[in-house]
Amino acid sequence: MRVLLSNDDGFHANGIKALKEIVIKSGIASEIWVVAPLNNCSGSGRSVGLNVKVQVSKVSDTEFIVDSTPSTSVFLALRKIMNYKPDLILSGINHGVNIGNDVWYSGTVAAAAEGAAINIPSIAISQEYDNKSGEINWVNPQRFLKQIIEMLVNVSFWNKSTVMNVNFPLMPAKGIKFTDQGKYVPCNEIEKNESSDDSNVSYTITRITPNKKNRAQCDGSIKAIDEGYITITPLKFDMTDFDVLTSLNSLK
């Protein structure tokens, strides 16, 4: 199996290194490619570098650094960089979960979505970390990811235009739950940077996902992660609200 790895934390991030090590040890891949952004692109969503020159640097015959977004990285990998399309795309392991509204912002999910757009099985993988210390470990992915990948690639009813979004909890995992995405109200952690010019002010958005205390009433993947479960959520990218569409059509 030819596997393409990408992410949104950047080519040199620890998460994608951990992912590659897991894939190698699992023996599921006969060929591993890594095509990932030069820099951290967290929160970039599905932005693509249109009408700009994108520098691609070759690290080895199967490793490339793209000076652009996660979506651009995979877009180019599938059309210009790789000699053959991959059998599977794995995006991650992201430093932080992608649950609830996160999927709208996530470059990790976006990288996987580029594969799903042309019906390549694609999995986004994210790991919760300690908000206070910033520490992260890969124990849960190391223990469970091989099993999850093997299970998913053998699902006969998986519509390959659907991204499988996998999130690992910080605590030792209690098991796996298949969940809906869920939703939350974004938090307001924004820092105003010091400036002597009131007409030219800068801000830093430090956090979007609410902490556990402020998401206690949330459901779906948010609740399951907070309970200590690995979550798997199938995501499709036709975002039409068909109930509202039906109602709108009744206005004719």
UniProtKB/Swiss-Prot annotation:
Superkingdom classification of source: Bacteria
Q: Which residues bind a divalent metal cation?
A: 8-9, 42, 94
Which cofactors? a divalent metal cation
Q: Entry's InterPro entries?
A: SurE (IPR030048), SurE-like_Pase/nucleotidase (IPR002828), SurE-like_sf (IPR036523)
Do the record's keywords include Nucleotide-binding?
Answer: yes
| Top-level class of the enzyme under EC nomenclature | hydrolase
The alphabetical list of record keywords is: Cytoplasm, Hydrolase, Metal-binding, Nucleotide-binding
Q: How is the cofactor bound, as the UniProt entry phrases it? A: Binds 1 divalent metal cation per subunit.
**Primary localization:** cytoplasm
What is an example of a GO molecular function annotated in this UniProt entry?
A: metal ion binding
Reactions catalysed, semicolon-separated, are: a ribonucleoside 5'-phosphate + H2O = a ribonucleoside + phosphate
Localized where?
A: Cytoplasm
Keyword Phosphoprotein set for record: no
Q: Which family does it belong to?
A: Belongs to the SurE nucleotidase family.
Which HAMAP family does UniProt cross-reference here?
SurE (MF_00060)
Q: What does this protein do?
A: Nucleotidase that shows phosphatase activity on nucleoside 5'-monophosphates.
According to UniProt, the name of this protein is 5'-nucleotidase SurE
Species this chain originates from: Ehrlichia ruminantium (strain Gardel)
